[in-house]
Amino acid sequence: MLKTIALDAMGGDHGPKVIVPAALSILKKHPKVKLILVGKEDQLALLIPEKNRKSFGQRLEIIHASEEVGMDEPPSQALRTKKNSSMRVAINLVKEGQAHACVSAGNTGALMATARYVLKTLPGIDRPAIIAAFPTKNEREVRVLDLGANVDSTPENLYQFAVMGSILSSAAHNIRNPRIGLLNVGEEEIKGNELVKKANELFETRKTINYIGYVEGNTIFNNIADVVVCDGFVGNAVLKASEGVAQLIKQHAKEAFSEAWWTKLALLPAIPILKRLIRRVDPERYNGATFLGLNGIVVKSHGSANIKAFVCAVEEAIFQVDKNIPQLIKEEVAHILKEFENK
């Protein structure tokens, strides 16, 4: 059976100019995937060569949506007035069972508000969270959540995030009990604000996750945890700082290779090492954050994503469809709730 992904083709800073070529790249690479491009049909059709229309056949479909959500548009306004936006129609396709997942590079707040309104949260989950993968000092990734969906969270919210993150990490890396860390300003028990301290007590009391204790910001990337949990305010700061550092490394590397010819000659032996380093920290490679905890799969691409980065976001959606992540979360949460009821 084909895995069908709906793409908000008008979303992001570059819209169809990035999303259509990325879609064609995905279809070439993944023969068992169907993509639905949602947006202004006349604009989208112009960007698809006739040879691709013929070769991909029914695996490539366009569904017209007359409106688009602006990157600075208030979420409440988009939800209330843009009922025929490419974003809303793409999410509706997931709700109606015509698509297994939705990917958008559009306005994050509007996407979260619309996805939550249309799809609703899974039973036992109070709030969805944004989760994404980050590189570590070895080839294994660490997944961090919440990256900005909830500025204010409760200890119970953080616990639910931990459960969901554990399930996703387990599926992604084929590990039985992913290590869960709670982000804090220190490893000592006395450190942290009230939210973190109470969440720590809750994590230790409930033995349903492999909780390893506090993780500091400077050890997120040291492969001591598979999942790091925090509230959305802190998580978004971690995300933006990490992206900034990665871009700084890339920029310095490019500047080094734009120096005089003798500098380039001296750097020649280091080129393979630098390329590996740049590849490992490249934000494009890790593009694709998931709105975890919804009755459906919604993946958020960075608004400024290029073709390569948007492809990565779509591949994250394909992976989650393969593993049926929402169903795994639903089953695990139901199992945990049943355990608590029996105690």
Curated annotation (Swiss-Prot):
InterPro entries: FA_synthesis, Phospholipid_synth_PlsX-like. It holds the Pfam family FA_synthesis. Keywords: Cytoplasm, Lipid biosynthesis, Lipid metabolism, Phospholipid biosynthesis, Phospholipid metabolism, Transferase. This is Phosphate acyltransferase. It is found in: Cytoplasm. The lineage of its organism: Bacteria, Pseudomonadati, Pseudomonadota, Gammaproteobacteria, Legionellales. Its EC number is 2.3.1.274. One of its GO terms (cellular component) is cytoplasm. GO terms for molecular function: phosphate:acyl-[acyl carrier protein] acyltransferase activity. HAMAP family: PlsX. Belongs to the PlsX family. Disulfide bonds: none annotated. Homodimer. Probably interacts with PlsY. It catalyses: a fatty acyl-[ACP] + phosphate = an acyl phosphate + holo-[ACP]. GO terms for biological process: fatty acid biosynthetic process; phospholipid biosynthetic process. Catalyzes the reversible formation of acyl-phosphate (acyl-PO(4)) from acyl-[acyl-carrier-protein] (acyl-ACP). This enzyme utilizes acyl-ACP as fatty acyl donor, but not acyl-CoA. Pathway: Lipid metabolism; phospholipid metabolism.
